Every structure is written in C-alpha cells, then in structure tokens.
Amino acid sequence: MKKWAIKAAILLGIIFLTNAVNAEGYMYGKNEVDLSYEKDCYLQQESPDWELMKKRPKVKGIYMTGYTVSMTERFNKLIDLVKTTELNAVVIDVKDDNGLMTYSSNLPDVGFTGANKNVRIKDIDAVMKILRDNNIYAIARIVTFKDRIAGDKYANLAVKNTSGGIWRDRHGMSWLNPYNRDSWDYLVDIAEEAAAKGFNEIQFDYVRFPTDGNVKIIDYGTSAAGKSKAEAIAEFLSYGRERLSKMGVVVSADVFGLVTSATDDMRIGQHLESIARSVDVICPMVYPSHYGKGSYGVAEPDFEPYKIVNRSMSIAKGRIDAMEDVSRKAVLRPWLQDFTASYLERYKRYGPAEVRAQIDATYDAGSEEWLLWNAGNVFTSGALLKE
C-alpha cells in the first residue's frame, strides 16, 4: 500500500488480535484500506522536475556517522573543515548498517521495531540548523535493504529461506525483501521524515540484493515472479524519487564500483543504465583498494588511485552519455577512498597525494562532484583546496 505508518497502539492491537506472530518476529499487520499503489510499474514514470538539480551545488562532501555528529568537538572540527576548504556538503547516517536510527524517529512503525533504541543524535533539529546557517548541503544516508532491526521484527518484510524462515547472511543479518513493496514504504517513510527535517538529498545505500552467505536457499516469494533483480531495484528507486521529489529533495544511490563497467546487474540488482533512469545522482564506490589485481590492466589497483578512478568513471560517463532514449539522466558522483587499506597483503598508505589524485581523476573523467569516505571520519585535509 502507499502509506503504512500506523499508530503503535493500533498496530499492537492488530498483531495481538490476529495472533500474527511467528517464531522469528511480528508479521506487519495491514488494514484493509488503500491497498493499491498508484502504478503497477514504477519504471513507467515521467522524470521529475530537474529544477532541483539546477539549484543544488556541485557536491564535494565528506561522510559522518551518527556518533561523530553527537560528539560536539569532532562535529565542529569537521564543520570547520568544510567551511575552510572546497568542501560544501556532508553525508550523515540516518539509518545505519544495522538498521538503527541515528536520531529518534517519530514514525510509529520505526519505533515499534526498536530502531530508536540507540540514537546518537539527540537534537537533529539543532544539527540541521548548523548546516543551514553555514550553507552546507545535507545528505541523509539511509542503509536500505540490509536491516536486521526491521527484518527481525517484521518477518513478512524480510528475505526468506526455502524453509520459510528469515534468511540471514554470513554475519547473521536479516535483509528486507527488495521485491516487497511494503518494505519500500518502510524505507521511503524514513526518507520522507529525513527530508522534512531539512536534508537536501536522500542517499540510499545497500540498495541491492544480498550477496554474502548461502544465497542459494533464498526464496523471494511470489512478488519476484516475472521480475528481474535489476527491475526491482530500479522500481524501488523510481518509487522513492517520485515521493521524495514532491518534497523538494534530490535522490541518490550508492552502487558498487564495478557497476560502472559490468554490463549485467552482477546478480545484486545494480545495473548502471537502469539506475540512471531512476535517480538523480549515482554514487559509484570506486575505492582503488576494492578492485582485484589486474583490473583495467592495473597490476595492483590500490597503488594506482588515479588510473582506477579515472578508468571507472570514464566508462560510467560514456555509458550514461550513450543513453539516447532518456532525456534526463543521473549525474555521476563517486565515493573516493580517503583511508589506507591496511587489511590488504600489499597496500599503499593514502595521504594528500593519493586522495587528490582521485579527485583529479574524477574531473578528468568528466564528472564534477565527489564524496570522500573514511569510516572513522578522519579526513585528509591536505588533499583539499583551501577557501
């Protein structure tokens, strides 16, 4: 259904009255009102008004966890970094890799899952005011289908195994079923709430099918009949963009770096041209350390950051530019490596030269935007131009 946020008391009543509980979690209780979506296929839609895209800046950003935002000194240092360099944007976790909210959501369905149990950001409105006052473009990162909190609580939204139980990856994580439109609503409702808080852009991460674990025993159910994984992911993103564009926000999607050159969906539902029709911005994670030896003819990719990023982004831009059947196509904005991949057998220590090489490679490939990734939120200021 189109909207499914139900007051907690009503939801609990439905659950207990219908005994809709199984051993692995609550079944999401539906009412019988408005069970139809506006469209059968969300790939069949007009592109939203791109005035949003014309007004926004050429994004140059960094990533922040909820924990970093909650630590006043760390947060202020990063805000100062943005203010004193070419940076103009921040990506902030809203729903993290475990499915937990970083600030307290007012959505009853989210509260019922327990996703608010460990919020880091106590006053998101104050954070948003700081960003607005400093003219910093705010991007909400929402980890999408990887969600052990909602997947465990609402069993009927989760990916199942062939025995009918909740499927789990090799880390014990449950995932929301990308074919299930009710899981779409859980996610887009969170995105709409973030947009209402003042985020300029919603960035969907882990917007894919699971890969780790015994995927051979996955059963996606009847909703998967006759539909490819790539279609399911593209439809979800189109549906999200349709709802979010009405709120005046941009929609972006993170994709694996290899998506830029793979001609299929890599069995995860990420196909470049399909996603380019469904979002405003595509963010390939082109970290050199993540490429196998010999990729693009480079013996050790981690040692050649310029070559890997430039080649990846050049291929992606060429493919998107060649899409003659679409008048409006997604902008490319890569995630770049601002960390040292010390887990590799042989690795290069990344400093100002290596980070700047990736930025230059992005520009030389014809893209004008980029984001820096460091999981600990410690960024290489020496790689950035001063303002």
Map each language-model feature to its residues.
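Aromatic-lined carbohydrate-binding/catalytic grooves of carbohydrate-active enzymes
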Residues: 85-121, 211-218, 384
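Active-site-adjacent "subsite" loops/lids of carbohydrate-active enzymes
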Residues: 50-69, 145-196, 356
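Substrate-binding cleft of secreted/luminal carbohydrate-active enzymes
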Residues: 279-290, 305-310, 315, 319-387
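Glycine-rich, aromatic-flanked loop segments that form ligand/cofactor-binding clefts
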Residues: 88-94, 120-166, 201-204
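Aromatic-lined carbohydrate-recognition surfaces of secreted/lumenal glycan-active proteins
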Residues: 139-147, 203, 229-268, 326-339
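Catalytic domains of carbohydrate-active enzymes, especially glycoside hydrolases
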Residues: 76-100, 196-201, 281, 362-369
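Active-site-proximal loop/short-helix segments
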Residues: 106, 148-156, 197-228
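An active-site-proximal structural segment forming one wall of the substrate-binding cleft
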Residues: 71-74, 80-85, 130, 172-207, ...
